[in-house]
């Protein structure tokens, strides 16, 4: 039994030995895993390195945790600081203005506001042509040299077969030798060329002659390119001087006001404002705006259509435009007359802009535009409306932020839905926010909301005209439907009492009389009661010489179903 157990144990012990043999054979056949085992085993054999690795993390752990805690605290403080620091709108605008000024300064130094001149382009094209010709000639020379070397190699191939076999065997194992192949080939070709010269000198002489015949154009063309480069480097680049509306850019506080307008037009996006400024400068140069202003040409036939008159309640100059004048065929019958009107309109705009005192921070640097749509041409005249859209777009792009408010009065019923549909296409959102539309019945109230009646021309419902009462204040009153309204003008002593009165909408009755304050005196009729129609003179001007204390009583009878607005002023002298 003991012998059997010994034999079994021996068999068991022998079993793993038998299994190890095929494994070792496999390991020997595959070289890569054996190398990995040897590389891994190298650090494991050093027993001294193990305790060092185990000790160092334990010592460095608290320091790392401390650094992490410090970094977290710093991040928390930064976050708190970011939450606390909030830039106001003025600070954001100042920062954007400084960035914009830097970009404008760089553009002036690089002369980016001037368009490239055509002669310079021609010179560049000539230089390019010469360079291309030289490149083509070099290519032809290289091709000829390649053909000559190929011929030499074909003739001498049987002489050196062993060298090529050695090259192919040496280039396979190492990648770096593949890069050195062209050098080796060059050496071989030179050796072959020397042998070829000994064998056949005639072919070499022919090749040299062909090469020499091509070389002279290189020496002739090369100095031309060098001369052009030297001329380009010799030209000094000076900063460009650009001015808009008579104000040079980046000179004083006036330019800050102008640059701020371009920033506001592009919502303080600096790069977009710079492109807008460049486009405006280019547009002014192409259309010769400065020369147009200096010419001083005035066309009286357009003055009835567009004119500047008075100021609004905030001090902005008001510019009135009458779209009904576009129906005049004598003025707007063809494109030439339309373009003539556009140039005159630009000239008027330039004069109004140049009259602004940009150095005064309290001065208003924008305008109020009042556009009268009474008797305006219908949508059937597409060419005319396309011209109007183009003109509006030009003013919006090249005169940014010069409109404080735009009032459209006497707007017909068809224009309101048209504007709601196509308004987003015609104008920008910023411009639409400044627009106010009013129909015929609400036009006067809309104007008087922004402009005082004494500043509004008589044509548009005001009392602004050259009279002795111009400096007097105007009083407004409302006459209710189917009611009378009386106005009393006192006279404390003997004097001459003058007054001006206007009823918006007409269709009322007007009368005036003098009533003395002393007993026993009789009333005196100054103006008999009469009806005022829409065709009558809109402004009633009257006066009375008072001989004793009393008052002038004016009676207005409104028998219509609509309320009426009355404007009047008076003066004693």
UniProtKB/Swiss-Prot annotation:
GO biological process: cell division; pollen tube growth
Keyword annotations of the record: Acetylation, Cell cycle, Cell division, Coiled coil, Cytoplasm, Isopeptide bond, Lipid-binding, Membrane, Phosphoprotein, Transport, Ubl conjugation
CRAL-TRIO domain segment(s): 295-468
Keyword Signal carried by entry: no
N-acetylalanine modified-residue sites: 2
Sites of Phosphothreonine modification: 29, 118
Cysteines engaged in disulfide bonds, as pairs: none
Predominant subcellular localization, coarse grouping: membrane
Recorded GO MF terms: lipid binding; protease binding; salicylic acid binding
Gene3D superfamilies: CRAL-TRIO lipid binding domain, GOLD domain, N-terminal domain of phosphatidylinositol transfer protein sec14p
Gene Ontology CC terms: apoplast; Golgi apparatus; mitochondrion; plasma membrane; plasmodesma; vacuole
Tissue: Expressed ubiquitously with higher levels in expanding roots and leaves (at protein level).
Biased segments, Basic and acidic residues type: 18-28, 35-74, 120-169, 176-190
Coiled-coil features, chain-numbered ranges: 89-157
Region annotation (Disordered) ranges: 1-74, 111-202
Subunit structure: Interacts with the deubiquitinating enzyme AMSH3.
Any further remark recorded for this protein: 'Patella' means 'small plate' in Latin.
Protein name: Patellin-1
Organism: Arabidopsis thaliana (Mouse-ear cress)
